[in-house]
Amino acid sequence: MRLKIPNVHLLAVAFACTPFATVYANNSVGYRGIVSVQPAPKVLNAQEKETFAAIYAAIRSEKWEEATRMIDAAPQGPMSAMARAELYLAPNSPKVDVAQLQALLEAAPYLPQAELLATMARKRGLEIIPSRPGIRRFSWLGGAPKRDLPANKASDSVRAKLQIFIKNDQPFAAEQFLESKILDLSPEALTELRYRVAWSYYIENDDASAQRVGAVAQAAGGAWGTQASWVVGLAAWRLGDYAAAYDAFDHVARFAGNDDLKAAGLFWAARAAMATQQPQFIQPKMQKAAQLSETFYGLLASEALGMEPIARSVAKVGKFDWTSLQNQPNVILAVSLVEIGQNKRADAALRHQARIGDVRQHANLAYLAGALNLASTQFWFGHYGPSRDQSTSTARYPLPNWEPTGGWRVTPSLIYAHALQESNFRTDVISPAGARGLMQVLPGTAQGLARARGSSFKAADLDLPAVNLEYGQSYLEKLRDLPITSGFLPKVIAAYNAGPSPVARWNSEIRDNGDPLLFIESIPFWETRGYVAIILRNYWIYEMRENKPSGSLKGLAQYMWPKFPDANGTVTTRRMIGGTIAAR
């Protein structure tokens, strides 16, 4: 298979510094909205919805007699059993006698609360507890690849002192301090700290020193040596020493301990082979990178080769088989609870069913969770299960049928790419910094946006998907329009994570030579550096889920800067030469 790059442009693509005849490309992707998923089944009639909504309202308000009366009068089945369990277990509710607990356990042993009810019954003197389904232990099924640093080897005190110099942008002082501690450090700790010094030199644009210190760490081997090799490759690339860059990136490709870094090493080794006119190495490296299909560089390699991305299998929209689920009480519970807005309880019912039911229904339950817009539940099914045989990678990328309060102005693919990374689709999660909900919006940021549009705002509203998505997309639009991002998608994503001020600094501090991939890999903040690649990877997979061609993927595979998608989802790309947009 041949690279999808014209031969006349090979070196220009490698260096990203030679003017092209065409420097603007319009890659239309045509926003068509969310791919319709299989509609969720309906279980309750209008009267039943009203009844059970009122029951849960009474329990929430601690109106115990009213709740009991309504449960007794309601149709008896999974929903009434669930409500009764909630009543019995609610804080401050009247004490339940053993006979009532026994009766409920005998009638509904399948309930998510069954073990709690059994414990309560045992404490109150019930000697023979009604049998309940066995609860299966689940395993981690794996997740999307992520670039991680190895475990720290240096002592906290030495690392902390070194970090003072690094944070003060003093890599030479950091190196001197490290040299004074050589006899006190293990070989592994010394390699780790040399990597950190090399990276400090690199972000200060002292590439020769970064290459020198990094090469010593690389020679020591081990996981930190591989990290140092990555720095050596980047520094050599910026110095124009493409042969050394190839050797360093090839070392990363051979010894990286995770797929994300391995794919990066392969991709950049192919770039270096292109720059050194070694065509025999280009395609094999790219093909190996493409096999690491759920990585940022794996997707770029597939695009560069003109291959159908292997990751499309992850992006397929699965359908559930209702006929094999409709007689399961917990499934009936989940569907019914969603109909009355009790999503957390629906989540508990589906997870419990997965643990007590037929293991062959695991993917089926995941697809049902998606149809019910239980995005965090579906995400959980994609990561945990009885065995890898029952895993469904599609569930790792939920595509709920939500809509911001102001309608979609930013393509859902990009919004969900952020929600996936920010919260794993947990609607009510709050970070230590106070950021809330799906897109981890800070209440202060939302307050400012609300004030600008003359609307009221309550922090608790950020727990509502429609509200959170609205403020999230509004903030992305604001970042898009700032001069410091110029509307370039990687910079908008970086600003969403790190804030606008760091991006403003990086515009002048990062020597990327107009290369968007070099910009991404040179971001000083570890978290933001990984964040940009993860969001773009998520974005591309969501575009596959929506059956869209990807303008940003196509552009980045040609080392062009993708702009933020417009209202129709269209992405334009621009070639930048030496840090400035090339003239037409």
Q: Where are these predicted regions, by residue range?
A:
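Alpha-helical tetratricopeptide repeat
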Residues: 45-55, 84-85, 155-162, 192-195, ...
